[in-house]
Amino acid sequence: MDSKEEAIQLITEEKHFSDDALAYFKTCIGGRDVGVNYHVISVFGSQSSGKSTLLNILFNTSFDTMDAQIKRQQTTKGIWVAHSNELLSNVDVNPEDKSDLFILDVEGSDGLERGEDQDFERKAALFAISVSEVLIVNMWEQQIGLYQGNNMALLKTVFEVNLSLFGKNKNGHKVLLLFVIRDHVGVTPISSLRDTITTELINLWETLSKPAECENKKLSDFFELQFVGLSHKLLQEERFVQDVKSLGDHFIMKDNEDYYFKPEYHHNLPLDGWTLYAKNCWELIEENRDLDLPTQQILVARFKTEEILNDSLEVLKSKYDSNVDPVIKDKLKLIQELSVLKTECLDMYDQHASKYVSAVYLEKRDELEAKIYLKFLETITLFIDSVSQDIFLQLVEDVNSESSKEPIFSKRLSNSTEVAKSKFEDIIEEFAAAKILSEEVKEEVVKRFENDLKETSDKLRVTALQKLITRSSKIINARIKDVVPQLLSNPDVDVWDRIMDKFHSIFSSTLIKYKLDDDTYDFQFGGEDEENNSTYKSIRVAAWKSLNDTIHDYLKEDTICNILRDRFELKFRYDDEDSPILWKNEEEVDLAFRVAKEYAFKIFDVLALIKTSDNVEVVPDINFHDSDEMYEDDLGIYHSAKFSHILNEVQKEKIQIQVRRQINVTVLDAKRSMIKTTTHIPLWIYAIIVVLGWNEFMMVIRNPLFVTLTILILVSFYFINKFDLWGPVKSVAQTAAGETIGTIKTKLRDFVLEEHEKTPKIQSEKSNSDSEKVVENEKS
């Protein structure tokens, strides 16, 4: 186990925490699991007070020390850390019992090099208190009783910030403040010096601005105090070494009441955890502004430079609108005008503010420049938005141009995007080169444009992809509608095999130009594999939907009935040579009926379910249904809505009944026609007619009137039959007959009415005659 490691700079003088700290600690412990068996000691005090020398002697470290014979100056810069297992003491320690010690050498306070800038020494002191178990406060005996000399002002600030940052999280944790009084000659006893320092610290603690949760806390709740005097190193070297050994005993002798490594001082973190804790503490301390206490010069400089900044900015604003508005659409004039305004504003600030503290002057100048950039950004943004819109319009036009020399969309889009980006960056670079646009704003504007450009490119790609999907789907749909109904109109038992072969052939031929050797697809839109797969699936879904709709729309109940009836009639009415069949008897009709019926219904089950000739149901290789695979019919019965299911049981039964009725009618018609063709007048009837009608026939021939009438009748019959005028003749005959019957009915009605009217008159006259006779008889 190495007892000594070269020190590294844990925190630089520029306040950066080392990224190599954890690796250094691991190197120090050599891969051992030390757990929490380690200790952290820090030293704090004025510059050139011998802090590094004390640490090197006490802990056997190798921190750089000042050579007083050459020059008294700053030696330790920042905060350094070293590892050791050795302690100078009067006690021999077993090597296995030695702890790993990490010693922090903190840059001295009140140094000439930093002057009034006390920011780092405050933060370094606060960091040392926050991460250490023991903080050695190194001071000269003659500094005791002073306020600045013994760092009381610094400790006050550190205590206040320590309470605000870490006070509520202490949970009983304490830090040992070990005051090492150098060059103690013994005139003033240590007890007296201890009382003086303790009183000063208690009084200082009472004056602190404490947070509410620490209002009643005492100094002893956070810190324990120990005091040690060391003789003069040069004048009393032997006594000095002995005093250091006695000091080392307190770090080793655990049974000693004044043992310095008490458990309540430890942070109880493993070494890698302590490293992260230390880094977080430094970041928290670095961000805290309560430690940035400016000097009076800085306060004045800040006030005056702020005033000058505002005046300069007001002058710029007063000229801004009148100078900028007329040239806002002219890039070159706009850049020139903004540059002039910025130069005038900064020159005015420089003229009046450069006399103050340089750091503050430069800080405020940067602030003024940032405000100028912010003011300019409003105008530049308007100009850039207008330019961006023109660039995007040109991009869309170039990408969608049909006259482009680049046929592949992805390359066309990529080339157009690069042109648009380059054009925009050139414009922005002109503003940045004129220093009227900060680098941060430039990067932000370019990033925003790139985001908008990506969004526009993505939209163009999505639109083009959608067009491709739509175009491919339409092509596939049209070809499916040409092929599938034709195959289904004259189906065979292997109709579904042929339809599926056609379907896959149509799909493959449509997308063949996008297919790669590994059976994947690249639609040449510059998308990733996932986007190409999504496009392929969309086209595949559209193809399956088209096939599904075409089949299910075509194979309705009536269509299937017609297909079955046509198949029946084809087999029933025509022979194998497509010639009409003339039946001789009913047995032939019945036989043909059975054969044709079997032939017709052979295809019925094939049309009811989409399956291959191997009796395997066809299942789409992609899900394209938007709803459940069940639907409810008008009767409230649920049926499958799968692609392969054409007919349910109810529909199948309905179709069978309807087809049977239709083919039965066809058979009856066939039997009737057979009876008509077989029923005729016997030949002997014609012989009897000739024998019996011979005289009448001769009479007609010998009579010119009968001959002429017969010729007219035969000619009329010929023309009526030739031109198929039987319908009109029949209509005329029916009309004439109707007119004749109507006339006869009218005449009969008139006759009956006349008779009815005559009868009452006769009866009346007869009655009158009878009454007259009765009267005459009565008179006589």
From Swiss-Prot:
GO molecular function: GTP binding; GTPase activity
One example of a Gene Ontology biological process annotation: endoplasmic reticulum inheritance
Residues binding GTP, per UniProt: 45-52
Family: Belongs to the TRAFAC class dynamin-like GTPase superfamily. GB1/RHD3 GTPase family. RHD3 subfamily.
Protein name, as recorded: Protein SEY1
Function: Cooperates with the reticulon proteins and tubule-shaping DP1 family proteins to generate and maintain the structure of the tubular endoplasmic reticulum network. Has GTPase activity, which is required for its function in ER organization.
SUPFAM superfamilies reported for this sequence: P-loop containing nucleoside triphosphate hydrolases (SSF52540)
Region of interest called Disordered, as start-end residue ranges on this chain: 756-780
Domain GB1/RHD3-type G per the UniProt entry, residue ranges: 35-265
Record's bilayer topology term: Multi-pass membrane protein
Subcellular location: Endoplasmic reticulum membrane
Coiled-coil residue spans: 440-463
Topology, Cytoplasmic side: 1-680, 726-780
E.C. no: 3.6.5.-
Topological domains annotated Lumenal: 702-704
Residues passing through the membrane, by range: 681-701, 705-725
A GO cellular-component term linked to this record: endoplasmic reticulum membrane
Keyword hit for GTP-binding: yes
PANTHER family xrefs: PROTEIN SEY1
Keywords carried by this UniProt record: Coiled coil, Endoplasmic reticulum, GTP-binding, Hydrolase, Membrane, Nucleotide-binding, Transmembrane, Transmembrane helix
Keyword Nucleotide-binding included in the entry's annotation: yes
